[in-house]
């Protein structure tokens, strides 16, 4: 069974802070990690939910490149998980294109998305915080996804 975790944050304020994300994939006896910058720092579109969706998209794009199918994907954002599972509607205009891309990737992967409490998502959270610190120090400037392992 292949399991992926994603997380996002926007600090020091939400919206309008630095939106970063992290993800981890457990693939057989390997661990693949990644993180990234979701949006231009301190912009109106820099939000926690944009970061969460960006982390999910980056995770699923990485899974597709690895040829993974039918993964279980876990995240601690109830909003994102419930929107992706059709339980909540997507209302925020800035989220709609991210949601549509994520749904397309979910279908391609045949992925199952499950909400988990924050305590079960520590690795992805840690990676989103690593990305945040790199942005703060000027070492991560480009929006996008970085695969670490």
From Swiss-Prot:
Q: How is the cofactor bound?
A: Divalent metal cations; Mn(2+) and Mg(2+) are preferred over Co(2+) or Ni(2+).
Instruction: Please give the SUPFAM superfamilies that the UniProt record associates with this protein.
Output: Ribonuclease H-like
Quick one: which residues bind Mn(2+) 1?
A: 7, 52, 76
Task: Describe what happens upon changing residue 91 to A.
Answer: Retains RNase H activity, considerable loss of dsRNase activity
* Record EC number: 3.1.26.4
Give GO terms: molecular function aspect only.
DNA binding; metal ion binding; RNA binding; RNA-DNA hybrid ribonuclease activity
Question: What UniProt keywords apply to this chain's record, in alphabetical order?
Answer: Cytoplasm, Disulfide bond, DNA-binding, Endonuclease, Hydrolase, Magnesium, Manganese, Metal-binding, Nuclease, RNA-binding
Which reaction(s) does the protein catalyse, per the Swiss-Prot or TrEMBL entry? Endonucleolytic cleavage to 5'-phosphomonoester
Which superkingdom, per the lineage?
Archaea
Residues forming the RNase H type-1 domain are: 1-140
So what does mutating residue 58 to A actually do? RNase H and dsRNase activity increase slightly, decreased thermostability
- Known InterPro entries for this protein? RNase_HI-like (IPR053576), RNaseH-like_sf (IPR012337), RNaseH_domain (IPR002156), RNaseH_sf (IPR036397)
Q: What is its main location?
A: cytoplasm
Q: PTM details?
A: The disulfide bond confers considerable stability to the protein.
Enumerate the PANTHER family for this protein. POLYNUCLEOTIDYL TRANSFERASE, RIBONUCLEASE H-LIKE SUPERFAMILY PROTEIN, RIBONUCLEASE HI
Q: Subunit composition? A: Monomer.
Protein name from the UniProt record: Ribonuclease HI
Originating organism: Sulfurisphaera tokodaii (strain DSM 16993 / JCM 10545 / NBRC 100140 / 7) (Sulfolobus tokodaii)
Name of the coding gene: rnhA
């Amino acid at each position: 069974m292949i399991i992926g975790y994603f997380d996002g944050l926007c600090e020091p304020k939400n919206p309008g802070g630095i939106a970063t994300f992290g993800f981890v994939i457990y693939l057989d006896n390997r661990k693949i990690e990644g993180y990234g910058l979701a949006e231009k720092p301190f912009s109106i579109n820099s939000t926690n939910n944009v970061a969460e969706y960006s982390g999910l998209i980056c995770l699923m794009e990485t899974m597709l490149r690895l040829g993974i199918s039918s993964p279980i994907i876990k995240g601690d954002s109830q909003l994102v998980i419930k929107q992706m599972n059709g339980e909540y509607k997507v209302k925020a205009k800035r989220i709609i294109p991210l949601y549509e891309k994520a749904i397309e990737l979910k279908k391609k992967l045949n992925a199952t998305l499950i909400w988990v409490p924050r305590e079960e998502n520590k690795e992805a959270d840690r990676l989103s915080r690593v990305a945040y610190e790199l942005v703060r120090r000027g070492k991560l400037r480009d929006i996008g996804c970085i695969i670490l392992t």
